[in-house]
Amino acid sequence: MSDYTQQLQDKKDHLKTLFAGLDVPEWEVYESPDKHYRMRAEFRIWHEGGEMFYAMFEKGQKAGGASLIRCDRFEAASEAVNRLMPELIAVAAQSAELRNRWYAVEFLSTLSGEMLVTMIYHKRLDNEWMQAAQALQQQLDISVIGRSRGQKIVLKQDYVTETLKVGNRDFRYRQIEGSFTQPNAAVCQKMLEWACGAAEGLDGDLLELYCGNGNFTLPLSEKFERVLATEISKTSVSAAQWNIEANRIGNIKIARLSAEEFTEAYTGKREFKRLKDGGIALTDYAFSTIFVDPPRAGIDEETLKLVSQFDNIIYISCNPETLRTNLDTLAETHTVERAALFDQFPFTHHIESGVLLKKKILGKSKR
């Protein structure tokens, strides 16, 4: 058994143990490539004896020479990132403006090879730096952002445009520097396919909480009459709106509300001007399904009460422990019809998973 296969089996075994006692079907397992799967990567820039190189540090140890790991290549990162790494360091090394006090770098790439590089400094960035960075940007055919304390200099653009294939359709996504995106694009496509499969035949309208840049929203919109998606981050809402227009989708509306705020609006506890200004009347919707992709902390108690009211729940989780806690509550009203493990983060302990729940009929399981 290969190292990759073994670590994936270990994750599946962990889920089986964690969810023991709950009526969960066999876990569907979606593999990742074993290398070049990360579209994002971050490194410190280490300066030593006139040399400059990429570095990471041993987990749990203080950043410094004793815990230093030199990274001339990084197998987990996309091939585009690996190709660019030596070129970027070589070009930057030739310029004092680019080299001096360069502290860290962040790469954001796409499946097509588009590249955004954020160069982080411990100095004020001036016109001389901008001129040098523009020359580097042109030479390497990338987009560059310069960051320092209190400064963000965007030389061309602060985003990349990713294309993900779901079924027979390509979806374009604007992914903005510093905002959340799924780092493993290959597995992300599998997650989108799975979610669309879980939604097959559910019909009606869809409510989505924590929609981000519309990663799941866009393909799921093909499975429902209308979609109302909520997200609190202004940056993510802006990206989601661009993505909706770029993909010419006409049945999605975005509400800039947190999950907690939406719960208050849905239950009639509060009215929100943001909903009215967006032309959103909750009474117009006939929701059959709710889709949730919460942060690591899981779904809070009040929002969980809201979620439990829906006939169908599609729940994507980045933390199986909080998923288990939430399912202990949801299992009182729903049965788990499907369960999936997505290996979004190979060779780490992190597990991404998904479940489809359907409301029990007369207290009996549908399964």
Swiss-Prot record:
Annotated GO CC locations: cytosol
Keywords in alphabetical order: Methyltransferase, S-adenosyl-L-methionine, Transferase, tRNA processing
GO molecular function: rRNA binding; tRNA (uracil(54)-C5)-methyltransferase activity, S-adenosyl methionine-dependent; tRNA binding
Residues reported in the UniProt entry to bind S-adenosyl-L-methionine: 182, 210, 215, 231, 293
Cystine residue pairs: none
Biological processes, Gene Ontology terms: tRNA methylation
Catalytic activity: uridine(54) in tRNA + S-adenosyl-L-methionine = 5-methyluridine(54) in tRNA + S-adenosyl-L-homocysteine + H(+); uridine(341) in tmRNA + S-adenosyl-L-methionine = 5-methyluridine(341) in tmRNA + S-adenosyl-L-homocysteine + H(+)
Annotated catalytic residues: 318, 352
Domain of life: Bacteria
EC numbers, comma separated: 2.1.1.-, 2.1.1.35
Family: Belongs to the class I-like SAM-binding methyltransferase superfamily. RNA M5U methyltransferase family. TrmA subfamily.
PANTHER family documented for this protein: TRNA/TMRNA (URACIL-C(5))-METHYLTRANSFERASE, TRNA_TMRNA (URACIL-C(5))-METHYLTRANSFERASE
NCBIfam families for the chain: trmA_only (TIGR02143)
Function statement: Dual-specificity methyltransferase that catalyzes the formation of 5-methyluridine at position 54 (m5U54) in all tRNAs, and that of position 341 (m5U341) in tmRNA (transfer-mRNA).
Protein name (Swiss-Prot/TrEMBL): tRNA/tmRNA (uracil-C(5))-methyltransferase
Originating species: Neisseria meningitidis serogroup C / serotype 2a (strain ATCC 700532 / DSM 15464 / FAM18)
